[in-house]
Amino acid sequence: MSTSNFLPDHNPVMMLQTPFHSRVAAACEMNEWGAWQGYTTPNCYTNVEMEYFAIRSNTGVFDLTPMTKYRVTGPDAEAYLDRLLTRNIAKLGVNRVAYMVMCNDAGDLVEDGTVFRIGEQDFRLCTQERVLDWMSWSAVGFDVDIVDETADVAALAIQGPTSCRILRNMGFE
């Protein structure tokens, strides 16, 4: 492909593919693709209406690799997240996940997503937007490390009313 048709200041960039891309591409009957956080992702697989009702009555699997993932560790990780999130992190058990909302000091919504408790002082936050600068600024006074793991951690969401049964049948508890 010749790049002579691009504007002089245009910098063509290859879109990233998730580790699940080959399976996703095989399932993408509509062949309608878009961009999400620099990754090539399907806009839908078969039919938007069918997909909506499938996840409400059965199970849907989604490639969430493009979502932003932060690892928060250190002696003050729980205290830091207890300040940052509108959820009592002390009540979140190890190997559990919960919905979370991040708010600034004025109580304004910054971002929402999920928080995974990997260990006593080891957490992963999964968000749509990139908020590392704000999280780092909010960590002043806390002994924590915050690392953007987005490029290193792939993710699948398995959702719907039959998802637990399917996972149990696969050997997961």
Predicted regions and their residues:
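Acidic, proline/glycine-enriched N-terminal capping motif
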Residues: M1-C103, D108
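Acidic, low-complexity central loop/insert segments
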Residues: E111-E173
